[in-house]
Amino acid sequence: MSNALYQSSINSLPLLGHGKVRDNYAVGNDKLLIVTTDRLSAFDVIMGEPIPDKGRVLNQMANFWFRKLAHIVPNHETGIAPETVVAPEEVEQVKGRAVVVKRLRPILVEAVVRGYLAGSGWKDYQATGKVCGIELPAGLQNAQKLPEPIFTPAAKAEMGEHDENISFAEVEARIGIALARQMRDISIRLYKEAAEFAATRGIIIADTKFEFGLDDNGVLTLMDEVLTADSSRFWPADSYQVGTNPPSFDKQFVRDWLEAVRIDGKPWPKTAPAPQLPDEVIEKTAAKYREALTRLTGEELQ
């Protein structure tokens, strides 16, 4: 699978670090080069095999949304072509899968918005009738649409740790009341506008995660990735049914396989190392990512 990039090696720029999926490099003092690789992380563990084209799909999808939602909140884009900041022999590594962005002070809270009850939100609700301390009506089912989208923040965890759901009061305590409210209100607005658009393309955005930073003037700025198949749960509207887990356009396919796999007769404990993904799972996952891009944006992979 020659078109897959598991890890970049850009030697012409200082490496700042490898995230689960992205590799970050410094461009001067005020910008970053973010390379979206084909790594896949599930249950906060990085798989050993890349998913071909996944990084390019995510990059193109995020760029689509940054453009579409730019009227709501400033974002980290600079418009500088990534090919211009690396050495000629490194251009192939950044083509279609990298962006040059403003360097921001990240806010260490993940801004999660849920329009539907799913995943950890559904588990919380079953146990307590609430999600992140927010009271919900009784009798809701799995995958049910919520009366209004809710803001359910999470504390950003260290690499390999699970992000932890926190209450809104905790966010206010961490970053201040005014900023917390601004972040919540903008996140819900971004989600609503994106969900409305996605509905016209036959896709339900069940939930999504935004990340924000502050620029040098303290202005709240959208960063990282936005409304991609990695940061969101996308469901095809035509097969959606309340009470069942709809098939997602994301790594759910890998997650389901990992839940079912047995190692020496035992379930995988969701800790590294990850079991080796079969070719069929890799190919189906790659196809899901490409399908999400085309269905949602109307664009082919560039």
Swiss-Prot record:
Pathway: Purine metabolism; IMP biosynthesis via de novo pathway; 5-amino-1-(5-phospho-D-ribosyl)imidazole-4-carboxamide from 5-amino-1-(5-phospho-D-ribosyl)imidazole-4-carboxylate: step 1/2
Top EC category: ligase
Cross-referenced Gene3D superfamilies: ATP-grasp fold, B domain, Phosphorylase Kinase, domain 1
Keyword Ligase: yes
Sorted UniProt keywords: ATP-binding, Ligase, Nucleotide-binding, Purine biosynthesis
Any one GO molecular function term: phosphoribosylaminoimidazolesuccinocarboxamide synthase activity
Protein name, UniProt field: Phosphoribosylaminoimidazole-succinocarboxamide synthase
Lineage, uppermost ranks: Bacteria, Pseudomonadati, Pseudomonadota, Betaproteobacteria, Burkholderiales
